[in-house]
């Protein structure tokens, strides 16, 4: 009577050992994966050095002149040439001029492409949480594909969706303020950055 039961018992014991071993390996893998994931958040590299007074001066001068030029021309000609995302662009093209994200192709191309994406999302999807997320994420995707990644472009796309004063402009938003404003900022960057002996802008055009 016990003969047939013994193989079943051995099979059951082997199955339980296999399940426990798999469970252990799975838990071990999850633990290691979680620890690796959390370790990435520790950083570990040294922070950048402090900026010298001369660098502070040129960064201040460029950003002041760039934003002032857009604001002055906007008020004088009663044409929208200034949007909030230009404030973020000023940080890059006047204070982090060696960054690949600050080069002319990225500055102008990033704003124009993002403006087109933002307006399109607004026209097709209206003003919703989905359209806001789609505008920003799609703008990032297209900028990456076209080698025009410019972080302020995400804001340019979002502005097209959520700003009531911008919405009536439609695709004119791509021309002004996005396109023309970015060109004004670029012109000021070319003039001010290259006045400094140790600065050279841009690093490349294409």
Provide a role label for each language-model segment.
Residues 126-152:
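Internal alpha-helical transmembrane segments of multi-pass membrane proteins
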Residues 98-106, 143-154:
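Membrane-helix interface "capping/anchor" motifs
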Residues 2-112, 116, 120, 125-133, ...:
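Alpha-helical transmembrane segments and their membrane-interface boundaries
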Residues 82-86, 150-156:
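Transmembrane helix boundary and interhelical junction motifs in multipass membrane proteins
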Residues 135-142, 157-164, 178-183:
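Hydrophobic alpha-helical segments of small multi-pass membrane proteins
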Residues 91, 114, 151, 157-158:
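Short, electropositive, low-hydrophobicity segments enriched in small/polar residues
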Residues 116, 120, 145, 157-160:
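Active-site beta-strand/loop microenvironment that shapes enzyme catalytic pockets
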């Amino acid at each position: 009577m016990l003969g047939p039961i013994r193989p079943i018992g051995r099979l059951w014991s082997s199955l339980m050992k296999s399940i426990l071993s798999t469970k252990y390996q799975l838990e071990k893998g999850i633990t290691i994966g979680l620890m690796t994931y959390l370790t990435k958040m520790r950083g570990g590299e040294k922070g950048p050095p402090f900026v010298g007074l001369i660098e502070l001066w040129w960064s201040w001068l460029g950003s002041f002149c760039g934003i002032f030029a857009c604001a002055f021309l906007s008020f004088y000609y009663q044409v929208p040439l200034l949007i909030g995302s230009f404030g973020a662009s000023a940080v890059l093209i006047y204070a982090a001029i060696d960054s690949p994200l600050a080069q002319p192709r990225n500055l102008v191309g990033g704003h124009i492409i993002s403006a087109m994406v933002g307006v399109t999302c607004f026209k097709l999807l209206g003003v919703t949480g989905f359209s806001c997320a789609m505008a920003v994420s799609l703008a990032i995707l297209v900028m990456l594909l076209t080698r025009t990644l410019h972080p302020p472009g995400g804001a340019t796309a979002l502005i097209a969706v959520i700003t009531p004063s911008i919405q009536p402009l439609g695709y004119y938003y791509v021309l002004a303020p996005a396109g023309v404003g970015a060109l004004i900022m670029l012109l000021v960057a070319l003039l001010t950055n290259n006045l400094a002996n140790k600065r050279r802008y841009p690093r490349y055009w294409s």
